[in-house]
């Protein structure tokens, strides 16, 4: 499984996402730009921002999200701004300004709403906002959210939309997982006794019935989206920064590693800078893919399950296209059903 290595960032990666077709990958970095890449050959298609005095971000870009039509791109940064871009032209269509950094953005499944999370800082609370999008005239957007959730407890770090867009699921600094009503902004459910440290990533399953969380407590957990019950736990020896659920195959991929400041040697093994594959049902590790020279900060899986990508502290993105053997593998033999190829 030889990777395609994407070299286009000068600093560490914060978030990478495939588009719905899987032919493009978008990467957000601490170097203030977002890049778009062809996943088939690693060619850079374009850059959003990065021009001095232009309308890009001024500082780290923490988060990126692309709509299901690959028409619009949302980004959020350390400059307290959220930006709407046209994918095709690279043009910034609109900018929202906040009082603190934008740590996460996400589209709902109908592409008619999106959420943003702003940081708790300088006396400002962590705020989750739900906006509607004007797709007809994208340069004319409302600065007023439909719903605003000002959090009094632990700050939110990540969030996803539940199917039908009635609820959002949030992960928090304390390890709490919560469900919020999109219309009322009320917290309708919360679990505070599963993860014991910051939630670094949250990603939905392909069918929308469950989701996975990654945490600094060195575990990833699989949750039922209706009940918020933990179904499976995947345990490692280092903080988990990102976790994905592979479509069609029974695997979970985890990325993380010892924080850069705590690594005393450049050995990949010492820092555990590998993508780690776990069996979804049996919770056992079944394989590793090495290559990065720093902790993996972000993972994304191809929507059809044909590849996955990792972005790391070393500034590189690696796209791994799975070989035929991956789709036929049965690490637990007769305990598993025959793969559908």
Swiss-Prot record:
WD repeats lie at residues 8-47, 56-95, 151-190, 194-233, 235-274, 291-331. PROSITE patterns: WD_REPEATS_1, WD_REPEATS_2, WD_REPEATS_REGION. Keywords: Cytoplasm, Initiation factor, Protein biosynthesis, Repeat, WD repeat. Pfam families: EIF3I. Gene3D superfamilies: YVTN repeat-like/Quinoprotein amine dehydrogenase. Its main location: cytoplasm. GO terms for cellular component: eukaryotic 43S preinitiation complex; eukaryotic 48S preinitiation complex; eukaryotic translation initiation factor 3 complex, eIF3e; eukaryotic translation initiation factor 3 complex, eIF3m; nuclear periphery. InterPro entries: eIF3i, G-protein_beta_WD-40_rep, WD40/YVTN_repeat-like_dom_sf, WD40_repeat_CS, WD40_repeat_dom_sf, WD40_rpt. The keyword Transmembrane helix does not apply. CDD domains: WD40 (cd00200). The keyword Protease does not apply. Signal peptide: none annotated. It is found in: Cytoplasm. One of its GO terms (molecular function) is RNA binding. One of its GO terms (biological process) is formation of cytoplasmic translation initiation complex. Belongs to the eIF-3 subunit I family. Component of the eukaryotic translation initiation factor 3 (eIF-3) complex. Component of the eukaryotic translation initiation factor 3 (eIF-3) complex, which is involved in protein synthesis of a specialized repertoire of mRNAs and, together with other initiation factors, stimulates binding of mRNA and methionyl-tRNAi to the 40S ribosome. The eIF-3 complex specifically targets and initiates translation of a subset of mRNAs involved in cell proliferation. This is Eukaryotic translation initiation factor 3 subunit I. The lineage of its organism: Eukaryota, Fungi, Dikarya, Basidiomycota, Agaricomycotina.
